[in-house]
């Protein structure tokens, strides 16, 4: 394990993707030859923000964790920087599983995927294709990437203008033209690109804490990120998910990924499946605050139940 002033419970690792990028993360080793989870954060968020607390709980319960930054942001390679590419992030999950299966002390037949918000959906999307995956934990997943309808025509026009500018720069001889970056959220708590999953003045006010916690966090994305989000329908292949067990943790007052969309999606899943429902929690309230301990207990129990063959199709929690 690495030491830096205080003892850390993880080692720093890197692994290659199929297209040659180095993705970087943390490996929290749990029980020898035991189960493991691949974890990634949500939209443009880096691995240092909040979810290390969850990784440490899994580790203390014998579950190893590979927590990594997807391509294009954080400590991982990939260009353009700050371009969120959810389809490629699904592939990053594939390659993270390949890496984790090769690590000593990991049971290669007991690896699950974990995601929250945007990555909660990409984890499901990855598991639809990758049958090496033993289970999925999806925390308040973004079921559909929606935009403010009145802004969509302007967003589409900005996307095309950006492509024109990048082509013009390459025509003029630039090898790596710099893309236009836009803030994730403005001072009044609205995405300048009308992306519904990023909103709320509280979210804007938390940005300094994010940057203090993770100096490599950048509170902006490329314009073309939103082209990729407009085209993204991550859960169109859910018919392929079964028989991989999934646990969804759903807040009853989700102000980012509408609660009813999550509930409807859960009901449509072919199973096996388990739901934990938290009536009084919002999107950011499951991994922060007083609910955290119970939320983590439910996730640890799910992993243990799946591996022990005790998995029930559905349970509830408040």
Curated annotation (Swiss-Prot):
Keyword set includes Magnesium = no
The UniProt record lists the EC number as 3.1.-.-
- According to the UniProt entry, the coiled-coil residues are none
The protein's GO terms of the molecular function aspect are: hydrolase activity
Q: What class of enzyme is it?
A: hydrolase
Q: Which reaction does it catalyse?
A: aculene D + L-prolyl-[peptidyl-carrier protein] = aculene B + holo-[peptidyl-carrier protein]; aculene C + L-prolyl-[peptidyl-carrier protein] = aculene A + holo-[peptidyl-carrier protein]
* Domain of life assignment: Eukaryota
Pfam families found in the cross-reference section: Hydrolase_4 (PF12146)
Pathway connected to this protein: Secondary metabolite biosynthesis
Phenotype upon knockout is:
Abolishes the production of aculenes A and B and accumulates aculenes C and D.
Q: Which UniProt keywords apply?
A: Hydrolase
| InterPro entries on file | AB_hydrolase_fold, Hydrolase_4, Polyketide_trans_af380
Q: Which family does it belong to?
A: Belongs to the polyketide transferase af380 family.
Q: Which PANTHER family match?
A: DLTD N-TERMINAL DOMAIN PROTEIN (AFU_ORTHOLOGUE AFUA_8G00380)-RELATED, SUPERFAMILY HYDROLASE, PUTATIVE (AFU_ORTHOLOGUE AFUA_2G16580)-RELATED
Described purpose of this protein according to its UniProt entry? Thiohydrolase; part of the gene cluster that mediates the biosynthesis of aculenes, a unique type of norsesquiterpenes that contain a nordaucane skeleton linked to an L-proline moiety and are of mixed biosynthetic origin. The pathway begins with the synthesis of dauca-4,7-diene by the terpene cyclase aneC using farnesyl pyrophosphate (FPP) as substrate.
The protein here is known as: Thiohydrolase aneE
Give the species. Answer: Aspergillus aculeatus (strain ATCC 16872 / CBS 172.66 / WB 5094)
